[in-house]
Amino acid sequence: MHPIEAWVNDLGHTEYKFEVVSDDASYRKYYRLILPEDKSFIIMDSSMQVESIYPFIDVSVRLLKAKVQIPRVYSQNLEHGYLLIEDLGDIHLADILNKQSHKLLYMKCIHEILKMQNADTAGLEEYDEEFLMFEMGLMQEWYLDQHLWVRLDDEEQKSLDSVLELIRDEVLSQPHGYFVHRDFHSRNIMFAGRGKVSVIDYQDARVGAITYDLVSLLKDVYIKCDREKMLDLVLEFKELKGGVLKDVSDEQFIRWFDFMGLQRHIKILGIFARLKIRDNKPLYVQDIPLTLEYIKDVIDIYDELKPLEAILDKVAEKA
């Protein structure tokens, strides 16, 4: 008998069936536990990395205290890394977005970001200078070197290093110290029952920049958001946040937002390539073109990013 089945039996369930919900980009798997009378739960299987269950529980408590909508945890098996959690259904943000619902749904999500930013951050790891650079380094290590087999010459390397340092400095110049979900995008935002927003996959949270989760939401690499509508929502967030942003110009805040997005998308290029090469998950490569599109959109706006454009143009033939 599989350990999950044994655990479910120990919970007192004898009639049930499983269905795979998600085998995501990480080491976690999700199954739907279907009981008689259409009652169901989700089992989060972290058995490949059992210790990861502790951050999930820790961050869950932080978010509940901040009144963020998250799935309830009903039971846990710390030995094997299993959690029995609330089944929120199968409706993600991307499934219900349309021209009519666009702003309403995104504003619901923005309000969840504002609540998350009130969560306790004590003891969480920081999105510091070293980690920002490490993440951006994934692009060269996995996307350029191993996915495209492109090597930069000395001048190109200097140009890339200079641009990455510029991005890092711009990110670090904005207000920090906020709870950061890190993957607050359409596949991690659920809608269940009367339009209630629920947030999932938050266990890798850190402390970071004020724009990070806003970027994850509005510059989502799985769905394209029109820039005019995007900036309208960016400024809605700025207005609602107030406080530390009260004396920040709209132009400056948009610049912070764009450079934060650039950092994130450069990292994602590396992660998608790594998922294919190291983890044998090639499907994510199909999302690289939109990721590159976001990067090029920002390069077109800010002249100081042109050296990055030259590098991307060089590799375009192999991309």
Predicted regions and their residues:
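Juxta-kinase regulatory segment immediately upstream of eukaryotic protein kinase catalytic domains
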Residues: 1-13
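An alpha-helical support segment within catalytic cores of ATP-dependent transferases
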Residues: 4, 121-126, 130-131, 135-179, ...
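ATP-binding glycine-rich phosphate-binding loop
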Residues: 13-31
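ATP-binding pocket architecture of kinase catalytic cores
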Residues: 28-133, 137-138, 148-149, 173
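Active-site acidic catalytic loop and adjacent metal/ATP-binding pocket
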Residues: 29-34, 116, 166-214, 221-225
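Protein kinase-like catalytic core scaffold
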Residues: 42, 69, 83, 178, ...
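Active-site activation/catalytic loop segments of kinase-like enzymes and analogous catalytic loops
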Residues: 140-147, 210-246, 259-279, 291-298
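ATP/Mg2+ or Mg2+-diphosphate-binding catalytic cores
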Residues: 270-319
